[in-house]
Amino acid sequence: MLTITVAQDGSGDFASVSEAVLAVPYACAAEIRIGPGVYREKLVCEKQDITLIGAGMESTRIVWGDGGSLPHPDGRPTHTFRSYTAFFRGIELRVRDLTIENDAGPGAKVGQAVAAYVDCSHTLFENVRLLSNQDTLFCAPLPEKEREKDGFLGPGRFAPRRPTAQYYRHCEIAGDIDFIFGGADALFEQCTIRTVNNHLPASYVTAPSGRADGLGFVFWDCDFVSDNCPAGTVFLGRPWRPTGKTAVLDCRLGAHIAPEGFSPWQSRTDSDLACFVEAGSTGAGAVARGAWVKQLDSQQAEELLRCARKLCRPE
């Protein structure tokens, strides 16, 4: 395996993460070790097998500030899928011990602001902090069709919609609107899911768009917290596409979580095809839900978690 070091003080092989990634031959497995510092760069990583390791979430930060409604160099708006701070496409991806942040600002001012756009066959994020406001983490693939012109403008617009398996462990993910979204099969274990308070009437954690026969998003043993959001104003999710799925298992929910738990997508009438399930929730936000949210018994929850680990956890 190729090993490359990045250090801003000149002691490494490169001074920027982007330069290090570009130096890796596509088919060569590589480990890039990134020293402390704020790396202000828009990262594009399209490699077959790559590992990025920082010096810790507090120490190594990759930051950029594009927003979906801000102008792009081509004269059009940037749109959601060109706003990313880091774009990953490949086969095997491992990211550890760093922060990826989009600091463009609140969605009301700059639109969607993706921190990480993840489109790899197998992904591991461990001890990673993902920070933004609207649309923080995009778990590819995209849906088959866009609903508005240029809605999918970006690196994956014409790419095949291939399944991806993504695993997030001991991560912190922060945002306010649909800040974990997409069509991946993804397992979030022992993560902190933090809703940022931008004084919105309602916020949404997930916006799944996966296949009807897919896993969707599964959260196990996670803490759902907020930056002092008003009680009952944050939904665990809403379906970005009709067959979206989110499961919340053995998680701790703050008082900011809405009593309904999940919400339909705006005024659409096909949300009854979505699947939102819950089991073992505790905390002030763990209350009786409506009929739309299925409550799993312990055996069903264990089986779902087993399937999620088999599909998403690295071997």
Report each predicted region and the residues it spans.
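Sequence-level preference for short, compositionally simple segments enriched
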Residues: 2-315
